[in-house]
């Protein structure tokens, strides 16, 4: 989240860092400042607290099953570098980088946040076709 907001004013970055620090310590933040509710609303805080307990690279190392790491090249929330770190931690995993795919598994020609949000909010846009075919192939191969 902090990476995603790195272009925001320092006061916003500091506020986000403070909230994240509390959540990482397992503490709920009852009074989220105006404008931060979408990211840190009360209903999502328990999930975030549980999420911060895990190191994805460590977790993936421990898996004893076939792993497919799927990453959209136009995802503005989880970066290609994050997927590459997972692959490095689990060399036997399959890494699938998909052109134009964003965080909600749809095609988006840009990483512009406003255009991404329009794609996020458009239920008529289909899931990326490469994802569907690749996921199907991976499952069939591993049966």
Protein language model features and the residues they cover:
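A structural signal for isolated positions on well-ordered beta-strands in alpha/beta enzyme cores
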Residues: 68, 94-96
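Solvent-exposed, polar/charged alpha-helical surfaces in well-ordered, non-transmembrane soluble domains
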Residues: 58-61, 84, 88, 133, ...
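Short beta-strand/loop motif that positions the catalytic acidic residue
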Residues: 63, 69-71, 75
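Accessory cap/linker subdomain of secreted extracellular hydrolases
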Residues: 1-50, 54-57
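Short alpha-helix in the alpha/beta-hydrolase fold that links the catalytic acid
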Residues: 65, 78-89
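Catalytic active-site module of serine/aspartate enzymes centered on a nucleophile-bearing elbow/loop
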Residues: 94, 101-143
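Acidic catalytic loop of the alpha/beta-hydrolase fold
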Residues: 74-78, 103-104
């Amino acid at each position: 989240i902090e990476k995603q907001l790195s272009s925001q004013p320092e006061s916003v970055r500091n506020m986000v860092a403070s909230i994240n620090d509390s959540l990482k310590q397992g503490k709920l933040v009852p009074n989220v400042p105006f404008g931060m509710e979408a990211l840190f609303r009360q209903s999502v805080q328990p999930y975030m607290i549980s999420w911060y307990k895990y190191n994805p690279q460590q977790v993936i190392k421990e898996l004893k099953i076939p792993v497919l790491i799927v990453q959209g090249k136009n995802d503005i929330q989880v970066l290609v570098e994050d997927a590459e770190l997972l692959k490095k931690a689990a060399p036997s995993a399959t890494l699938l980088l998909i052109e134009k795919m964003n965080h909600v598994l749809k095609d988006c020609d840009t990483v512009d946040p406003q255009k991404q949000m329009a794609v996020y909010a458009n239920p008529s846009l289909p899931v990326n076709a490469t994802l569907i075919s690749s996921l199907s192939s991976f499952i069939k191969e591993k049966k």
